[in-house]
A protein has these predicted regions:
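Acetyl-CoA-dependent GNAT
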Residues: 9, 69-73
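Conserved acetyl-CoA-binding loop-helix of GNAT-fold acetyltransferases
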Residues: 1-18, 23, 36-41
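A short, internal acetyl-CoA/4′-phosphopantetheine-binding micro-motif in the GNAT/acyltransferase core
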Residues: 1, 28-29
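Flexible, glycine-/basic-rich loop-and-beta segments that form/coincide
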Residues: 76-77
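Conserved catalytic-core motifs of GNAT/GCN5-like acyltransferases
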Residues: 25-28, 36, 40, 45-62, ...
Length: 77
C-alpha cells in the first residue's frame, strides 16, 4: 500500500470544500474493510447500508453509504 487512494480522496475532499460543497457521499461495497477504513480515516461516517443491492461475479453485495460533512472534517485538524 503506497497511499495513492488516500492522496486521491483527500485531494477530492479539499477540492470539494474549496468549491463550496457542504458534504460528499460515497457508496462502497459494505464488506470491503479497507475501503471503509480509508473513508473513515478521511472523515466519512457510515450513514446506512442497502442490503443485496448489487451483483458482482454472481453474488449479491451490500452497499454502504458513507457521508463526509466537510466542515466537520476541517474541525478535526
Amino acid at each position: 500500500r503506497n497511499g495513492i487512494g488516500r492522496l486521491l480522496l483527500t485531494t477530492l475532499l479539499d477540492q470539494a470544500e474549496a468549491s463550496g460543497f457542504h458534504g460528499v457521499i460515497a457508496r462502497i461495497e459494505a464488506s470491503s474493510a479497507s475501503s471503509r477504513g480509508l473513508h473513515e480515516s478521511c472523515g466519512f461516517k457510515l450513514v446506512g447500508i442497502e442490503r443485496e443491492i448489487g451483483r458482482k461475479f454472481g453474488r449479491w453485495l451490500d452497499v454502504a453509504h458513507m457521508q463526509c460533512l466537510l466542515h466537520e472534517r476541517a474541525s478535526r485538524a
